[in-house]
Amino acid sequence: MIYRELSQAEFNDLASRILYEDNHLLVVNKKVGEIVQGDKTSDEPLTETYKAFIAQRDAKPGQVFMGLPHRLDRPVSGIVVLAKTSKALERLNAMFRDSDVHKFYWALVCAEPRPAEGSSLSVGFGECPHTPLSLNSFFNK
């Protein structure tokens, strides 16, 4: 399969967003506004973008496998785990299905939110840029 050629700037951006990689996994930082899998829009999903990246970086002439065991919505930023092999995808799917993966979500807001009755809220400190809400999802085992 022939993948599109990435510009040097896009290639460098994608490379800088890799948090972890081995023969089985690719863990990347997803930006707000990106989609992780195809939808009815013509936007290229992150899975296809990283297939093109791997093909170009490794000069791989054949098809690149990139499985998606979980998703993050378009308006969300955070960590996405991609499977580079079908066996890794199978195992990751089982981990998500069996709740062996723990997800953590953080929201950045400009005003101090009030927790709903019966819930808890941890408030941190930091600068508040006037940008849309951004959520981060972090995974660990």
Where are these regions (language model features)?
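RNA pseudouridine synthases
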Residues: 1-141
